[in-house]
Amino acid sequence: DLFLSLSSAVAPEIGEYERSATALFNAYVGRVIEGYLQRMEQTLFDAGLKHRVLIVQSNGGLVAATQTIPVLTIESGPAVGVVGAAYLARELGRPDVIATDIGGTTSKVAVIENGSWNYSRETVINQYQLRMPMVDVTSIGAGGGSIAWVDGFRLRVGPHSAAADPGPACYGNGSDRPTVTDANLVLARINAARPIGSGLGALDPDAARAAIQTHVA
């Protein structure tokens, strides 16, 4: 069977180029995502799940796995993070916050005002402009594993990454390159004794400080 991607169903709006590009991206990722969701749903049902499997879309909403338009799940992870941050902010009585999602090589930022977030109708992926509703999230090309280095007299961060292994210098896995995580540890923004992450022991502030002093200080 062929996977059919119809532009009028994927992006039912004016804009021939954007609509076509969105339909093409949907066709490119559609078969893989569709198969994955089918296998996942069947596995969950076999394990005893008695409810529908719902998938988050890039606009922060939910849709049944069987009705998912694959391309509309792009940036669904950051989107649901913003939705969760807005809920937590309201519960804490702080409706105006900046939500940040820091990954290994990128960081994503969204503004939440009065408990609500903004939406964007378009996004650019690999220079292709796609038309889809999505939570307005700004990406920055630096994450927790991004390595800091000096270019002449300028401090730069990224694009190289320490990755998960060996990871930042403070992990104690043999790396001596300073990362964003090392900087946050030295600045006491991270609790060395209680790091977030499965399997991580206590972090080493001295190793982080030595890496910074050696390479960028």
How would you label these PLM feature ranges?
Residues 1-217:
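N-terminally biased helix-coil "hinge/interface" segments that flank
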